[in-house]
Each structure stands twice: as C-alpha cells, then as structure tokens.
Amino acid sequence: MKSYLVGGAVRDALLGQPAGDCDWVVVGADPAHMESLGFKAVGRDFPVFLHPKTGEEFALARTERKNGHGYRGFIVNADPTVTLEQDLQRRDFTINAIAHDQTNDTLIDPYGGVNDLEQRILRHISPAFAEDPLRVLRAARFMARLAPLGFSIAPETLTMMREMAASGELNSLIPERIWKELSRSLAYTQPAAFLHTLRTVNALEVVLPELNALYGVPQHADYHPEIDTGLHQELVSDMAAKLAPGDMLIGFAALCHDLGKALTPRATWPHHPMHEQRGMAPTQQLSERLKVPRDYQQLALIACREHLNVHRLSKLHDHTVYELLQRCDAFRRPERIAQLAIVCEADYRGRYGHEDANYPQGQHLCRLHAAALAVNARDLNRQDLHGTQIGEALAQARIRAISSTGVYDGGTRTNF
C-alpha cells in the first residue's frame, strides 16, 4: 500500500497558488484494509475514505469505463492491481494528473502536466475526456480561475469540446451540476472566461441559453462603446468579481441584470425600453431551472428590476426612493442594499472606457437606506395611532429621513 498526493493541491503548489483540500490516491489497498487502519468509508460511487486524524480524503486508485449516456454512465474498477498511472489517466486535464510522492519528494507526471503548467496550457489527457460531458463545464470553470494566470485551452481540447457540445451529451447534465460549475466560476477573478469558453465551443446555448441570447444584441454606442450586450455581460461579471471578490451571490445577480435586453423588439434596437421588466421572466426561468438557492434568485430579480433606478437615483423623489427600498425588502434584509449597490456599480463600470469611473450612486443609496433604517416604530408617538396608521406614520417618518440626507428640488438630489 502506498499513497500519493494528487490533483489540485499538487497543481496549485506548482503554480505558487494557495492550495485547497488535499486529496490522496492509494495504490495497493482494498476497502477492508483501509477500514482496518481506521479510515472511514464515505464514497458512494467509488471507494473514498477519510483519514482518522486529518480528515483528508483518500481514494483507492481506480479506472473508469464508459457504459452509458451522460456523466454517470461509467463502470468503476477499484482494486489493488490498479496502478497510479492508470488512475491518473482517467482524470480530465494533464495539469490535474500530477502526483507527489512525499516519501522521497518526487513528482510522478506521466502525461506532461508539469510542462503544460509551465506553458500555461489546459489540455485533456486522452480521448476518454469526451466520455464525460461535465468536463466541458469544468474546462470553462478552470479558465475562470486560470485565465488571469495566462492559461489558454489547447486547440485539440477545444475541438473535442465542440464535438461534445454538438453530440447532444450536454443535455444529460442535471441542473445541480450546471449550477455548481457556474457558481464556482463566479467565485474566481475572471468569471467571464467561463461564459466565453462555453460560447467558443457552442455549449453556452445548450446549458445557459438565457445568457447566450445576449450575444449579438446591440446597445447604443454612446452608452455602451462595447455595443454587444453579451460582451457587456462579460465585462460586468469580471467587474463584479473585482468589486466583491469571491461573492457568488453578487456575481449571479450581476450575471442576470440585463437578461431582458435579449427580449426587446428588434425594431427598438439599439435601445432597450422596459428591459428591466422584460428581464424578470428569464431570470426566474434560469433560477428555477438550475435550482438556484432562493437568496441568489431574489437578489438577481432585485438587480434586474432596480438597476436603472439606482443609476438615476439623483432624479428620484424621496417617496420613490422609499418605495425602491420597500421593494427590496430592505428593512428586513438590510444587506441587500449594499449588494445591489455593488451590482449596479459593476454594471456602470463594466463598459469600455468606464472601468475606473466613479459611481457615487452606490454610496448615496447606502446613505439613504441607512437614514431610513435608523427610524423604527419605537421612535413614533403612537398614542393616537392605531392599526394601519402606525405603518403609514413609519413610512412618512422614513421618507422624511431620506429627505434629510439631501434636498430634492424636482430635478436633482443635492449632496450626491
């Protein structure tokens, strides 16, 4: 029995990046032997064990053979005769097929992963890559993480990904797996690379058709020098990642904010009247299909509906600002306003030539919200108030608090 450190921990160490969880592969052992050493079996589809002291995952070396449709149609063989090289060969990319023997501090790299790391290439290991459609999404997600380091996908791997997209295999992916790869990409510094990669291999139209529909839809060049709405969406996604690193909630809301532009009549292009309202349905549809968590869905719908109101905040009446806060449920969920402000700033700055622009609307929205939030029912003289009068009085008090942050003169809010 011998164990090797494998996968992401080895790859990240060689890249000089912070390593995540340590995964180990065990050669020459069976489940009974692992359990006799105190390891706890946790694998459902293949033998995986938790170390009795560290809790790290140790998987028995295995091979996989395709015997059905989709990413679950595999026969797994995990017995003591499976070699390390055979186990590494079943993996997706060469950079993930490097093992570290810690007993003598050597690397086992049968498929050229170290060289591909040095050349900044994401390359599949073997034709078996095409047997698992999930790997198309994994490649896109890896690009969201690795593109900032200068990585690109090998031409032969792109070709195989296109063939996989054309085969219909991607239709077998369950919504939860698509969401998992999408949401993880939103935690990286360049989530637009996820979208760009999928679109390059014609997979975006299959797994995320609502987002794919934005490409080729023109916007007015005076406001959007990048013109293409799909490109704007990529810029906004990357800007959101810059403004709120690792925040997948904000990232998803930023991703959905302009979905309505794909539904505006062609006759109105490059203008998109009512795209905020039009975007609610595809945002809901996307969220429900992928089984997106409820808090993600709610913030995405808020951003879709309200982003133009935040952009023109200086033109809004005090009572209109209060109504905006109410629609966001901002008095019960105060965190939403700061989140919305970041999404709107990402939208504003996610345009060619506006990357470093100031966006005072975000800070001002937070100030208006803070002023209104500071007022509560306990502050009211409630002796002569009954029933709905209390709520009405509280609303008026909060509107006065909003007004106190600046003077609205019918055209522009001061102190902005």
UniProtKB/Swiss-Prot annotation:
Remarks, miscellaneous: A single active site specifically recognizes both ATP and CTP and is responsible for their addition.
Oligomeric form and interacting partners: Monomer. Can also form homodimers and oligomers.
Q: Which residues bind CTP?
A: 8, 11, 91, 138, 141
Q: Please give the Pfam families that the UniProt record associates with this protein.
A: PolyA_pol, PolyA_pol_RNAbd
Amino-acid positions noted as binding ATP in the UniProt annotation, renumbered to this chain? 8, 11, 91, 138, 141
On the tree of life, the source organism's domain of life is Bacteria
What is its biological role? Catalyzes the addition and repair of the essential 3'-terminal CCA sequence in tRNAs without using a nucleic acid template. Adds these three nucleotides in the order of C, C, and A to the tRNA nucleotide-73, using CTP and ATP as substrates and producing inorganic pyrophosphate. tRNA 3'-terminal CCA addition is required both for tRNA processing and repair. Also involved in tRNA surveillance by mediating tandem CCA addition to generate a CCACCA at the 3' terminus of unstable tRNAs. While stable tRNAs receive only 3'-terminal CCA, unstable tRNAs are marked with CCACCA and rapidly degraded.
**What cofactor requirement does the entry state?**
Mg(2+); Ni(2+)
Report domain HD positions. Answer: 229-331
The protein's organism comes out as Xylella fastidiosa (strain 9a5c)
Q: Which reaction does it catalyse?
A: a tRNA precursor + 2 CTP + ATP = a tRNA with a 3' CCA end + 3 diphosphate; a tRNA with a 3' CCA end + 2 CTP + ATP = a tRNA with a 3' CCACCA end + 3 diphosphate
Q: Which HAMAP family match?
A: CCA_bact_type1
Anything noted about its domains? Answer: Comprises two domains: an N-terminal domain containing the nucleotidyltransferase activity and a C-terminal HD domain associated with both phosphodiesterase and phosphatase activities.
- EC numbers on record: 2.7.7.72, 3.1.3.-, 3.1.4.-
Protein's UniProt name: Multifunctional CCA protein
Q: Which gene encodes it?
A: cca
Entries under Gene3D superfamilies matching the protein: Beta Polymerase, domain 2 (3.30.460.10), cca-adding enzyme, domain 2 (1.10.3090.10)
List residues binding Mg(2+).
21, 23
BP terms from Gene Ontology: RNA repair; tRNA 3'-terminal CCA addition
